[in-house]
């Protein structure tokens, strides 16, 4: 089994698990109390439309979660193909304060500590404070923090947050790659064109 086949096997596993999860939720929703449709009706939506909205909202939550987990696992697998000694989910003690007790590195290759995100649309200002603390703990432990985010946000506030995070990483001596730069960086580091694999699946 070559690299692409191993990666494809992971994609198919996630696809099957996601479809199973959606079917389970669909069955659960058929047993639900839908009294809240009364308010949907008042706002101009039929009960049938209300069900579809609720169902798609559930599907959306599952899809978002599985998309993030899939891309993170695939990126780590690519890194491990190139660096068999890479470690996953490495926890470091919080050396700054008591919350949280530990911070996690998604993938560690020597001194290079990878944070992998499929996308990050947060608009929460506290996110920067939390990330600053996390990155400083990693840097103080002797590692180089590297953030790889494959898809960039669309909303202005979220874009501003990411610009601040990029500066944060660079100021502390780390690296930040997003959008096309993230795909290119992964390919350069591992020799695997993960985006091309996804484009093949789309065909």
Residue ranges and their predicted role:
Residues 79, 105-118:
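Conserved catalytic cores of phosphodiester-cleaving nucleases, focusing on short active-site segments
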Residues 1-83:
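Interdomain/boundary linker segments immediately adjacent to catalytic/signaling cores
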Residues 88-108:
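Active-site metal-binding core of divalent-cation-utilizing nuclease and nuclease-like domains
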Residues 80-86, 140-142:
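Secondary-structure boundary elements
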Residues 150-203:
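Domain-level recognition of nuclease-like catalytic cores that cleave nucleotide substrates
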């Amino acid at each position: 089994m070559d690299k692409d086949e191993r990666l494809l096997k992971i994609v198919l596993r996630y696809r099957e698990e996601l479809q199973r999860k959606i079917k389970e939720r669909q069955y659960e929703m058929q047993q639900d109390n839908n009294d809240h449709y009364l308010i949907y009706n008042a706002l101009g939506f039929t009960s049938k439309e209300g069900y579809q909205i609720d169902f798609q909202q559930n599907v959306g939550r599952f899809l978002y979660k599985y998309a993030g987990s899939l891309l993170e696992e695939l990126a780590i697998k690519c890194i491990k193909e190139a660096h068999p000694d890479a470690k996953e989910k490495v926890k470091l003690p919080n050396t700054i304060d008591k919350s949280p007790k530990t911070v996690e590195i998604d993938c560690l290759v020597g001194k290079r500590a990878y944070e992998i995100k499929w996308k990050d649309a947060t608009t929460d200002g506290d996110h920067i404070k939390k990330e600053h603390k996390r990155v400083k703990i990693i840097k103080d432990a002797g590692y180089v923090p590297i953030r790889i985010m494959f898809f960039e946000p669309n909303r202005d506030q979220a874009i501003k947050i990411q610009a601040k995070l990029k500066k944060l990483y660079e100021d502390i001596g780390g690296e930040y790659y997003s959008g096309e730069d993230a795909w290119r960086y992964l390919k350069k580091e591992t020799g695997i064109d993960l985006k091309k694999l996804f484009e093949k699946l789309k065909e």
